[in-house]
């Protein structure tokens, strides 16, 4: 959320074919819930393209990068590193400390995609568990970002959007930005 030091999300590992949807959702969740950028492994080409496309259509700012240097990204990070793992300290025990640190330092959130090596646990400033139960890494990322931003990410605006969702009790209403608020809603299924 551009008003604080940077928050970046690093997807650590990607198995093409098996992880495509989950890796894409890590990027979409990072964008929607306030991170400034996502870094994907170099082999996550389709996920990177999809998240860039969504950012182009629904606005940013949000950057998408690919890297072959996952470990170097962690080691060279200029701020603090938070590794999300079900084995870590309970989120509710450390979220205040992480939030306070984020006022001064950028945060790199590491989200595993396959077995994460012990080096990542050692390099992290915090290994954080959201419930310490097995569940989706996307759910863990969403809860963590909401705690980090204290819910402010839910009110953020998006710049340079081509399309915008109009919240409604029932149905789907997506407008082209140049048409303004009076544009006809998108057909069912559009904008998914």
From Swiss-Prot:
It is found in: Cytoplasm. Its main location: cytoplasm. The keyword Methyltransferase applies. InterPro entries: Alpha/beta_knot_MTases, tRNA_m1G_MTases_N, tRNA_mtfrase_aTrm56. One of its GO terms (cellular component) is cytoplasm. Keywords: Cytoplasm, Methyltransferase, S-adenosyl-L-methionine, Transferase, tRNA processing. It is an enzyme of class 2 (transferase). The keyword Methyltransferase applies. Homodimer. Belongs to the aTrm56 family. Specifically catalyzes the AdoMet-dependent 2'-O-ribose methylation of cytidine at position 56 in tRNAs. This is tRNA (cytidine(56)-2'-O)-methyltransferase. It comes from Halobacterium salinarum (strain ATCC 700922 / JCM 11081 / NRC-1) (Halobacterium halobium).
């Amino acid at each position: 959320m551009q008003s604080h030091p940077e928050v970046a999300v690093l997807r650590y590992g990607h198995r093409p074919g098996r992880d495509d949807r989950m890796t894409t959702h890590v990027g979409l969740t990072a964008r929607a819930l306030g991170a400034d950028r996502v870094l994907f492994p170099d082999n996550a080409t389709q996920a990177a393209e999809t998240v860039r496309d969504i950012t182009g259509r629904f606005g940013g700012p949000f950057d998408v990068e690919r890297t072959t240097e996952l470990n170097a990204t962690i080691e060279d990070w200029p701020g603090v590193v938070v590794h999300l793992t079900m084995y870590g300290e309970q989120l509710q025990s450390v979220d205040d400390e992480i939030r306070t640190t984020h006022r001064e330092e950028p945060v790199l959130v590491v989200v595993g995609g396959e077995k994460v090596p012990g080096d990542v646990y050692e390099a992290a400033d915090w290994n954080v568990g959201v419930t310490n139960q097995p569940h989706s890494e996307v759910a863990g990322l969403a809860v963590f970002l909401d705690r980090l931003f204290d819910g402010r990410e839910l009110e953020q605006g998006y710049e340079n959007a081509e399309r915008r969702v109009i919240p409604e009790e029932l149905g789907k209403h997506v407008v082209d930005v140049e048409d303004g608020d009076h544009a006809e809603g998108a057909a069912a299924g559009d904008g998914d």
